[in-house]
Amino acid sequence: MNRTLLKKAALCCGLLIASPFIAFGQIHEGGHRPDWNAIDTISFLSFNDFHGAFVKDRNVPGAAELVQAVLDEKAKNKNTVVVSVGDNFSGSYFSRITRGNPLPEMFREMDVKMSAIGNHEFDWGLPYLVDTAAVCMDYIAANIVAKDDHAPLEWLEPCKMVVQPLKNGGSVKIAFVGLTTTDTAVKTRSENIRGIDFVNPVDAARVQVATGLKKEGKVDMVVLLMHIGTDMSNPDVIEEENAKRLPWIEGVDAIISGHSHKVVLAEVNHLPIIQAGVNGTHLGKLNFEVKQDAGKYTIQYIGGDTIRVAGKGNSVIDSLVNKEMDKYGFEEVLTMAENDLIHDRNINKKDYTTVGAYVTASYADTFRKYSQISKKYGKQSVVGVNHYGGLRASILKGEVTCLLYTSDAADEED
């Protein structure tokens, strides 16, 4: 495995070498030499586990507000790099019916540089991910390889570099290394991940850094973009056992995480780790001071923030969402709810809830209807079952529309 990963890393590093950056000390166009004593700030802005939450709801800001929040933050610092940490499109009824639209336009509006691959990226099958999603955005994952021989995948790069210009005329080269939870192998339909394997994230990340991203001066910073869960209540912050050593890899400057839907801002081994909730409720922001002295960069973490997304929506994205709403009749009223029916992963995830009862009853009723079990066997008991993590939304008081189906996150292709 290590030999294969080294091969892939070498390929990635070769791409980095070919990138259009300017070597230290060179005179720039017009005879301008960088001011090596200047101080600048680079910000990493991230969101994760959007899950196709395009439509604004009581606890969900919607795509338009998320995009506008990103643009507002970028206006504060032009040296801002925007990234996604995976689980982008699957998880809402709206997104399933629209096939992920308008996610491509949304990413372009925010200038999202790349995305980690989340476990739910495979919900609609590998052909969709390879032929549609990966065409619209740059996915990266260093620990996803071919199952038979652990060879690199043609459609997937382990890392990507961003060359960020600075105000003095210089530039900082930042390598993002993608990682995906190895739980994907057991939590995803086998046919949706046929032919690929998920290897140890620490080994994969260490290979990427050790092959020279930092040591040979190819990049100035290395950021792990990982769809692996983190939680402030966990003593190690990183939840998965095979990923806990990631903060101790020499040469890594920051970890931007997703998967566990938590709001996280922490430091482990003096390394900043951030996660920005779920459904676009928050943005994660990490700030680094870049000081240039005698032709060398000194880069230091100076703080971060988890920003609640709220406020006006972006008119371009709002128009696109409304267009899809009208096209598919998502606002058709099915019934009325007299009270809020709450099923919240952070409140009563493992409790009996009315939402859970309705969803599982619908499974049983549908089975009775289409199997014609009563005609074949007479009166029979049918039990509908869903695991407690499978329900993702409440049913709120008032008009209940077709978007009700977002409550059931069983969003894989049939």
Please tell me what each predicted stretch does:
Residues 12-20:
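Bacterial N-terminal signal peptides
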Residues 2-10:
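Bacterial N-terminal signal peptides that target proteins for export
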Residues 26-309, 355-362, 366, 374:
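Acidic, metal/ion-coordinating pockets
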Residues 405-412:
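Conserved small/polar residues in nucleotide/adenosyl-binding loops
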Residues 96-98, 397-402:
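Charged, often glycine-rich, active-site loop that binds/positions anionic groups
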Residues 52-53, 190-192, 341-349, 407:
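Glycine- and acidic
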Residues 38-39, 171, 185-186, 290-400:
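A short C-terminal boundary segment appended to hydrolase-like catalytic domains
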